[in-house]
UniProtKB/Swiss-Prot annotation:
Record's keyword annotation contains Protein transport: no
Superkingdom per UniProt: Bacteria
Primary gene name: rpsP
GO biological process: translation
HAMAP family in UniProt: Ribosomal_bS16 (MF_00385)
Protein known as: Small ribosomal subunit protein bS16
Alphabetically ordered keywords of this record: Ribonucleoprotein, Ribosomal protein
GO molecular function: structural constituent of ribosome
Amino acid sequence: MVRIRLTRMGKRHMPFYRIVVVDSRKRRDGAYIESLGYYNPLRKPAEIKVNVERAVEWILKGAQPSETAANILSKAGVLAKVHEMKYGKREKSDEGVS
């Protein structure tokens, strides 16, 4: 199974993470298929940079994000874009308004 997850980079006590597409059987910092961006939790606010087009493409192909990666991709707007592409835009209805 192909997963989207984080791989740790940086030096001791100063981590940052790459968001990568990887075979789920590989080790955490092992070889990956493609790098989609990075996440730096030490910056305030946390710095997130993601190639949205490639991330959407991988998710539509069936790549499963890890729980942490899913939270980061959600903040970057990737999961909302995937939902919109799969199911269309949500329409507001006036049925409940009297």
